[in-house]
């Protein structure tokens, strides 16, 4: 059983116990507050595997999950923002993460310059937007929406 959960350090700065009609834990950040009641169902979390991108000096910033192959199994789509890649990973039969496809979304940043640019790619979603009943990968990069249709 995992007893420590990593919190996004940029979002939450403090964890405090509170009583709001029952025991709870609050997560406090500069512009956000969340609370978790300590009652109800108890979940046991178990680490299955871990993944480090093979992209040299890469930084995995965010992840979404979706079935991009039509197999009925979801893949993990990591947004790698240091070198601007999408990195697809899936679980094998032994519940181990296996690298799949990866590609660079763009070669260089826009005219705004890199100093104050947002991490790119910054948003992804998996949905059928082409109307062929197959999930597609939708990516927000700079001021563009890119659609990668499933073949």
List each model region and its residues.
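Beta-propeller-forming repeat regions
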Residues: 1-151
């Amino acid at each position: 059983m995992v007893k420590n959960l990593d919190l996004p350090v940029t979002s939450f700065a403090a964890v405090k116990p509170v009583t709001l009609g029952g025991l709870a834990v609050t997560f406090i950040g500069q512009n956000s507050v969340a609370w978790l009641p300590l009652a109800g169902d108890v979940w046991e979390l178990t680490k299955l595997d871990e993944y480090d991108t093979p992209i040299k000096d890469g930084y995995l910033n965010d992840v979404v999950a979706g079935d991009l192959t039509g197999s009925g199994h979801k893949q993990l789509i990591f947004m790698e923002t240091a070198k601007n890649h999408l990195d697809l990973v899936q679980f094998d039969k032994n519940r181990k993460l296996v690298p799949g496809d990866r590609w660079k979304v763009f070669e260089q940043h826009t005219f705004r310059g890199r100093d104050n640019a947002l991490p790119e790619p910054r948003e992804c979603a998996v949905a059928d937007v082409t109307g062929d009943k197959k999930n597609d990968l939708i990516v927000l990069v700079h001021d563009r929406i890119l659609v990668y249709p499933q073949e």
